[in-house]
Design a protein with these regions (language model features):
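Amide-donor transfer/coupling interface in amidating biosynthetic enzymes
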Residues: 1-72, 89, 95, 99, ...
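Active-site loop signature of alpha/beta-hydrolase-fold enzymes
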Residues: 46, 75, 111-112
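Short, glycine/acidic-enriched capping/hinge loops at junctions between secondary-structure elements
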Residues: 50-53, 79-82, 115-116
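Short, glycine/charge-rich beta-strand/loop segments that flank catalytic centers
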Residues: 70-74, 144-145
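N-terminal beta-loop-helix "entrance" segment that forms/cooperates
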Residues: 73-86
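Cysteine-nucleophile active-site neighborhood
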Residues: 100, 105-174
Length: 303
């Protein structure tokens, strides 16, 4: 089944060119099924690229999905026009009375700012609490995962000696997890972060599913809060890390070449994607598990 996204969203052309089936409202209305309602709180500067990355993965699942793009209510984007946001996004205040089968909270490039010093932290607290009453299952990603682990579990975040940057092999710790159906034993995962979570601060109600002893925890299951926490970036496209590297080089920053991204480590070559299949598996598993467990009557979500 296809994904339904806002009409005229620029991501549509990219998705259709890749073979992702995109559905308009009239066609969706003719199908006598309840589509899954998925929300995406997009905290990344490049909204269009991020929404395309997630739509690509959600739209490849065999179920009809309605995707709602959500943004922080009182925050002025420096990289996306207000017209674009008003056309394609809803503020969290506009959706806070809605129920969602699934909700995604993205990362954000604010690793150096303490949580309580972030201007929109109070709204983030409200959103995280709201997921416990209005969302059947939530996926928190990178900074979003760090924030949720801090809020729900008082997990300690610390600065690593050097930025973890590249594509790294990880270990599967629980191959029986429904989130990891079809995963190989040692998936490659894109990583781009300065911080890690102190694993000694993780309580017994959290299960580490994917790990790298040197790079840090990758994926955590949080059944108490009906959530998974992805500390890295399986959603990234081929050039996400490469563009970040080239941006830093142009800015004069001493950024290392992303590990295991380029053939023979040569940044002039085109990046090689070693994680695409696992990205699709994770999101297909997530959507399927939501479909199997969410109430048909959305009013029952969170009860």
């Amino acid at each position: 089944m296809p994904i339904r996204i806002p009409d005229n969203l620029p991501a549509r052309k990219t998705l259709e060119s890749e073979g992702v089936v995109v559905m308009d409202s009239s066609r969706a209305a003719r199908q006598d099924i309840r589509p899954l309602q998925i929300g995406l709180l997009n905290l990344m500067p490049n909204k269009e690229r991020t929404e395309t990355q997630f739509s690509r993965l959600i739209g490849a699942t065999p179920l009809q999905v309605d995707l709602t793009l959500v943004r922080i209510t009182d925050h002025q984007s420096k990289h996306t026009s207000e017209d674009y946001l008003k056309t394609f996004y809803k503020t969290w205040e506009e959706v806070r009375e809605q129920k969602f089968d699934g909700f995604i909270v993205t990362g954000a490039p604010i690793a150096n700012i303490p949580f309580d010093q972030l201007r929109y932290w109070p709204e983030m607290l409200d959103i995280m609490n709201w997921t416990q009453t209005n969302v059947h299952h939530t996926m928190f990603i990178c900074w979003g995962a760090q924030a949720a682990l801090h809020h729900f579990h008082d997990a300690r975040r610390y600065r690593m000696p050097a930025k973890a940057f590249g594509v790294f092999r990880h270990q599967i710790l629980n191959p029986r997890s429904p989130w990891l159906r079809g995963f190989s034993d040692s998936p490659m995962v894109p990583v781009s972060r300065y911080n890690d979570i102190d694993r000694t601060s993780l309580g017994p109600d959290l299960e580490i599913l994917i790990d790298n002893p040197e790079i840090g925890v990758c994926l955590l299951d949080d059944p108490k809060h009906r959530a998974v926490h992805m500390l890295n970036h399986l959603e990234y496209d081929n050039r996400s890390l490469a563009d970040e590297y080239e941006r830093d080089v142009k800015a004069g920053l001493d950024t290392p070449v992303p590990a295991n991204l380029y053939p023979d480590g040569n940044p002039i070559a085109e990046p090689e994607n070693h994680w695409r299949s696992h990205a699709h598996l994770l999101f297909q598993n997530w959507i399927n598990e939501i479909y199997q467990t969410t109430p048909y009557d959305m009013a029952q979500i969170g009860r």
